[in-house]
Amino acid sequence: LYAMSPMAARYSAGAPWLYLLADMPRDSQRLVDPADLHEGRARPKRKMPSLSINNPMEVLRQRLILEVARKQMREANQRQAVANRLFLQNVGKRGFWANSAPTRYDN
């Protein structure tokens, strides 16, 4: 069932798991072909978690876009309010026509 390992002579035959574990190479001892790294086949795992700024930058970008849109809407609303105020000041006023046309007709 077990193949004979080079370290089998050091351990008794009653404990085969010892030499099987001892014969397994560690990750740092394995040879990695540089061509494999470029093709993505044998990529070593990272020991620390990776940090990415893509998500926080996207959140900030969206908030900036929303803030710019809100500012433009506020300015447009203010311009419309001024235009409405001017319109309402002139509605129903007869003073504007008083200087240009006579108020009485002489027949």
UniProtKB/Swiss-Prot annotation:
The keyword ATP-binding does not apply. Residues 1-44 form a propeptide. GO terms for molecular function: hormone activity. Keywords: Amidation, Cleavage on pair of basic residues, Hormone, Neuropeptide, Secreted. The modification Valine amide is found at residue 91. It holds the Pfam family CRF. GO terms for cellular component: extracellular region. Its main location: secreted. Transmembrane segments: none annotated. It is found in: Secreted. InterPro entries: Corticotropin-releasing_fac_CS, CRF. Expressed in corpora cardiaca (CC), corpora allata (CA), antennal lobe (AL) and gnathal ganglion (GNG) (at protein level). Expression in AL and GNG detected in some animals, in CC and CA in few animals (at protein level). GO terms for biological process: neuropeptide signaling pathway. This is Diuretic hormone 45. It comes from Agrotis ipsilon.
